[in-house]
Amino acid sequence: MSSATVAASRRQSCYLCDLPRMPWAMIWDFTEPVCRGCVNYEGADRIEFVIETARHLKRAHGFQEGRSPGPSPSSSSSSSSSSSVKPQLSAKEMAQIGHTMGGPEGVTRTSQQPPPPQCLDRYSLERPPPPRLGSEYGLGRQVNGILLPNGFPKPEEPPELNRQSPNPRRTSTVPQSLGALMNGTPMGSARATIGLSGASLVAAAAATTSADLSGKRPGSVSSSEHDGKEKHRADSYSELGENHKSRAEEWISKPKTVRDTLMAMQHSHSPFDSKFKKDTGPGRVLSFEANNPVSKSGARGGRKRKTSPEPEGEGGSVKINGEGQPWLPATESLKISTMASPSFISPPSTVSPHSNRTTPPEAAQNGQSPMAALILVADNAGGNHASKDANQVHSTTRRNSSSPPSPSSMNQRRMAPRDVPSQLPSGGTSSHAGMEQGLPQSIPDSSIPNSIPLCCTLCHERLEDTHFVQCPSVPSHKFCFPCSRQSIKQQGSSGEVYCPSGEKCPLVGSNVPWAFMQGEIATILAGDVKVKKERDS
């Protein structure tokens, strides 16, 4: 016996691809022996369903169940044609068998009986596709949950499309004429175009209506529903336009500073149309009440919040008592401005950041708007830390910049309240200090470029953008290198060297005072030597 005969006798035919395989290439863990290639191609989780489908096909078309362990060399040529046809057979007939025989994947059963056994010689490589217009589909089939009329050829698809798996090719099976029917085209023209019976058209229309009534979202939104939403949205726009006119009349009685600020806020916010155009409906527009800062509309999670912090006046979400404020459109924020006192001015791009310094803060404490009071406190935060240096600040530190507020400009405002205590009533400064003690300090702004000049806390000379000493505890403590060098020499570089301001500023979150590291001291003192050499030369 030759080696080829011995090898052929040891081979086992795969149940699916019908090809002789070596024993190590076969898998016996399923109901039928299959090769590793078929298992990898179909997937181990679906191979049982494919085996069951192939078993039904073999029974229906007269294949013999019991195959010999390996084909003899003489019969290999005669069986080559059938073995080459078999993979196509199992691939193309699975969808039809899934409809007729049913399966474990949720395929719908019908009363169609399997076709009678047929001969093998009927199958060739040029076999036409099975008929799709018979009664095996029943009265209608469902696409995305909507019952559609029958009579349209379905392209050849893999068997997994019988399941409810999302597939982009699925939506392309509905003809354009049927899409016109679903979008509200008169039924007479649709019947003339498609050539369907009146019963199927009525069934399709009734199914679409029932899907809308049951709350299910149809595959394509009807034009009437879309027009209704657009009309509702247009009505809401007209109402908002009337509100704009009424508010414009109310602004006439306000002071000039308040009018300028309200106008700037109206233009700085993004328009309502672009902000809410993509919403599902105008029901997402939230209202604001003076007595209830947190809306009770139940749509707090309707719009996504931005995760990055934003300066005031830019549309960021403000928290009050630990609770996030709901998003408000530009028109609603104007309501807040009109209800608040003149001291609530969110600094826009055309107003000086300190335009609200000259007005007393008592109005914000009367309780008209908690958000107004909170933003006012945040604007004045940090003033108590620099109050001791207020009488030393040079006049060049007054801020008249027209740029919008940034974290760096907020820190610059904290450098000194300047002559504000002289302009405020007697209770103004104490109330500010009491509200500011609970606010955390912001980060140093040495790395943030801005147009406002930095000044040394001690000598009030202008600082460079990157070459100065920043106290990590008090943001308003900024010192030039000569002042820092002099302070280190006065305190003695051998021991602990604290803040050049002369105070022991505690670190954030602890009582330990901040002190220079030895490397920092060496760097500052080394700069003194270099400067002296440069001056000598």
From Swiss-Prot:
Residues 162-176, 334-366, 389-400, 423-432 have a biased composition (Polar residues). PANTHER family: INTERFERON REGULATORY FACTOR 2-BINDING PROTEIN 2, MYELIN TRANSCRIPTION FACTOR 1-RELATED. GO terms for cellular component: nucleus. This is Interferon regulatory factor 2-binding protein 2. Keywords: Metal-binding, Nucleus, Repressor, Transcription, Transcription regulation, Zinc, Zinc-finger. Acts as a transcriptional repressor. A zinc finger (RING-type) spans 456-503. Residues 224-254, 270-281 have a biased composition (Basic and acidic residues). The keyword Lyase does not apply. Belongs to the IRF2BP family. Pfam families: IRF-2BP1_2 (PF11261), IRF-2BP1_2_M (PF25457), zf-C3HC4_IRF-2BP1_2 (PF25454). Residues 73-84 have a biased composition (Low complexity). Gene3D superfamilies: Interferon regulatory factor 2-binding protein (1.10.10.1580). Signal peptide: none annotated. GO terms for biological process: regulation of transcription by RNA polymerase II.
